[in-house]
Amino acid sequence: MQWNKIKLTFILAFLILNVYLVFQLFPQEETEQTVLETESQDAVLGSVKGYKELSDQKTETNQQYEATKLHFTEDDLDKVPNNDNMDLDISSNTQLVVKFKEPQKLPVEFPIADDNDQAIGDLNNFVTDHVLFGAEYTYWGRQGNQLLFFQKMNQGQTYFSPDSLLLVTINEDYEVVEYEQTYIKNFKKLEENEDQDLKEYSEVQAVKALQSQQLIESNDTIKVEKGFYPTIELSSKPNYAPAYMITVNNEKHYFYLLLPDYPYVYAPTESGFLSSLQPETEETQ
């Protein structure tokens, strides 16, 4: 009888020991896995050109912004530079459509590389000379026969917003035949968001998030810029989230959006953006 008690005691002791070892083993494996992943990420980013120059200071927050759409008036039409060669239409109220009576030759030759600062500057100057508030728009790129320019606010550049867009149409001779313009003003912090506990983010944090999704690989070249990306409108006013734009190898653009709940990585395309601007047909409604 005594021997049975001793055996039972040993069995229980071994069971308790096994349970203890299991609980000790799993955290250790998770820790080792985390260390390996961190070491792997550090090795990749260590070879990425432009990474060492980034700041790890958390200087940006997820404070959301809002703006007001400009409603164009007849007085605005009188302020359009060189408007004697234009037919102007503001029938849609928040969009100005301009058609040139005589096509305007651009001061550049296509294609234009993203790092051709001289050509991009010449395009921006052309817009300044022919567009209302033209100095506030910055050239983004070309998609087919259309050139995209996005409005830049005092707080930073906006990206892929239908409400702060200049869309220039060119013909087969690379001459400007028309453009469509939207414009925002009163760009400010969203009041409903000001009382919330804001989270802080850094350039390094944004880049690491991309690398963890294998969007940045060894020996890539990156460039990080700050700006604002449109979000779902919670009212009649356009809403924007702060964003880090990460350009990889001067080809692919990713946006690390600082949304209210959690960050989100998004990679828009020019073609997709332009398609979203097209009005719905009766078949798709």
Predicted regions and their residues:
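Extracytoplasmic/luminal low-complexity segments enriched in Pro/Gly and acidic/polar residues
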Residues: 194-285
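Preferential activation on post-signal-peptide N-terminal prodomains/segments
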Residues: 1-138, 143-147, 153-157
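Hydrophobic residues embedded in beta-strands of well-ordered beta-sheets
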Residues: 96, 145-147, 174-177, 263
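Short helix-loop boundary/capping segments
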Residues: 169-207
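Exposed beta-strand-loop-beta-strand "reactive/processing" segments of non-cytosolic proteins
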Residues: 128-172, 225-258
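Noncatalytic linker/hinge segments flanking ATPase motor cores
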Residues: 52-61, 189-191, 264-269
